[in-house]
Amino acid sequence: MQGLVEFVLSNFIFTLINLWIMYWVLKKFLFKPTTEYMEGRKKSIADSIQEAEMKNKEADESKAQYDMKLQDIKKERSQIIDEATKRAEKRGDEIIKAAEDEAEKVIERAMTEIQREKQKSLNEMKNEISQLAIAAATKVIEKDLDEGTHHKMIQQFIDEVGETKWQN
């Protein structure tokens, strides 16, 4: 037994050739498909990441648009509420003004009615006083003058003396 391990050049060359053939076969049939699969998977993952980023970007843009729309809706809501409040206040003022105008008209009509009733009462009192004066004058004179003359005399008396007293 000379040495357990002996260097034989032919074995070494044969082993190198076998290794090279094995490397070539592995490269051709194992490494290349594995590398292609890994590259494809890498590309697929990169595409998925890129697509996810695009969708995130689109989602952010959509969210920004919705936020803007929401702000616009809030502004519009505030404007509508303000306009409705102003219209309600204006309508309330119009109703109050109409009520005040109507109250003034009622007061004016009442004052006119009071004046008319006052004048009517004064005229009735004048007529009654005239009748009483005629009756008193007839009794005093004991002579019956015609009614037209009596009435004329009484009316003249009332106009001269009583007019200032009736107005007070």
Curated annotation (Swiss-Prot):
Protein name: ATP synthase subunit b
Transmembrane segments: 7-26
NCBIfam families in the record: ATP_synt_b
Record-stated family: Belongs to the ATPase B chain family.
Membrane topology: Single-pass membrane protein
Subcellular location: Cell membrane
GO molecular function: proton-transporting ATP synthase activity, rotational mechanism; proton-transporting ATPase activity, rotational mechanism
InterPro entries: ATP_synth_B-like_membr_sf, ATP_synth_b/b'su_bac/chlpt, ATP_synth_F0_bsu_bac, ATP_synthase_B_chain
Subunit details: F-type ATPases have 2 components, F(1) - the catalytic core - and F(0) - the membrane proton channel. F(1) has five subunits: alpha(3), beta(3), gamma(1), delta(1), epsilon(1). F(0) has three main subunits: a(1), b(2) and c(10-14). The alpha and beta chains form an alternating ring which encloses part of the gamma chain. F(1) is attached to F(0) by a central stalk formed by the gamma and epsilon chains, while a peripheral stalk is formed by the delta and b chains.
Keyword GTP-binding annotated: no
CC terms in the record's Gene Ontology section: plasma membrane; proton-transporting ATP synthase complex
PANTHER family: ATP SYNTHASE SUBUNIT B', CHLOROPLASTIC (PTHR33445:SF2)
Record key words, sorted: ATP synthesis, Cell membrane, CF(0), Hydrogen ion transport, Ion transport, Membrane, Transmembrane, Transmembrane helix, Transport
Function: F(1)F(0) ATP synthase produces ATP from ADP in the presence of a proton or sodium gradient. F-type ATPases consist of two structural domains, F(1) containing the extramembraneous catalytic core and F(0) containing the membrane proton channel, linked together by a central stalk and a peripheral stalk. During catalysis, ATP synthesis in the catalytic domain of F(1) is coupled via a rotary mechanism of the central stalk subunits to proton translocation. Component of the F(0) channel, it forms part of the peripheral stalk, linking F(1) to F(0).
Pfam families: ATP-synt_B
